[in-house]
């Protein structure tokens, strides 16, 4: 891992406790073991549940209670969310989202597919996006905001806010219009989960292997308006860092360090 990446991760870790206290409703939901409201369970990424119905004395006797096929035969990463009595399941490309009723034999309440007319919201075809995706065509999951929104970060980098009850689009924005990378190809893609902080949703991007200048971008959860964007490499004004207060290896990184 590069020093830059270590610095970004350390900065994010320090900021998270403030974000948690600022979104008390989401924090309260995270503490409810009957729900799974964020990828990895909480901001700390513990991936731990306090539910004790399954334990070391009965785990060897587990049997399949039910199963659900998404119909997408690609790699799968990320976890389903459980909000109340509804489970939200996502897929790899084309990034379909399902809402299942856990009280009614996993009935499909709604299904959302961001690919319409063969294209993603940003105008890219599915085949075009697949051609520049690294390491399989996976998606690392949707996330939830307590205002009743499921957020999807699609493979073409679109950020899509869905009504948790109906699956209808609240807003859609294309994070990066696939950009032109070092080798003259549209190379920006999205596979990471959206991250809910206060009343914002943040997303990163992929494509550095094609020369894409990646970044972290924050959007207003209510309307999808872009709030700010910080790049992973300089100059400092584009990284949105204070070179004297941002540290690496316990020392200030200094002006234009990248």
Regions found by a protein language model. Give the residues of each.
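Bacterial N-terminal signal peptides that target proteins for export
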Residues: 1-9
């Amino acid at each position: 891992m590069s020093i830059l990446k270590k610095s970004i991760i350390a900065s994010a870790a320090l900021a998270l406790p403030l974000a948690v206290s600022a979104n008390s409703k989401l924090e309260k939901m995270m503490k409810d073991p009957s729900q799974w409201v964020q990828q990895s369970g909480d901001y700390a990424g513990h991936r731990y549940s306090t539910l004790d119905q399954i334990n070391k004395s009965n785990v060897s006797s587990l049997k399949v209670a039910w199963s659900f096929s998404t119909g997408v035969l690609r790699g799968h990463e990320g976890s389903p969310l459980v909000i109340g009595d509804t489970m939200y399941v996502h897929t790899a490309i084309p990034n379909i989202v399902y809402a299942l009723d856990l009280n009614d034999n996993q009935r499909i309440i709604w299904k959302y597919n961001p690919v319409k007319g063969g294209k993603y919201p940003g105008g890219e075809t599915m085949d075009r996006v697949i051609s520049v995706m690294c390491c399989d065509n996976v998606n690392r999951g949707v996330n939830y905001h307590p205002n009743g929104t499921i957020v999807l970060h699609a493979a073409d980098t679109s950020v899509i806010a869905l009504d948790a009850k109906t699956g209808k689009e609240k807003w859609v924005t294309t994070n990066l219009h696939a950009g032109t990378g070092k080798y003259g190809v549209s190379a920006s893609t999205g596979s990471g989960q959206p991250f809910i902080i206060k009343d914002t949703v943040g997303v990163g991007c992929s494509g550095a292997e094609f020369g894409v200048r990646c970044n972290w971008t924050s959007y207003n959860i209510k309307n999808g308006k872009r709030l700010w964007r910080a790049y992973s490499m300089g100059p400092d004004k584009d990284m949105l860092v204070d070179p004297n207060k941002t540290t690496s290896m316990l020392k200030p990184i200094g002006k234009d360090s990248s």
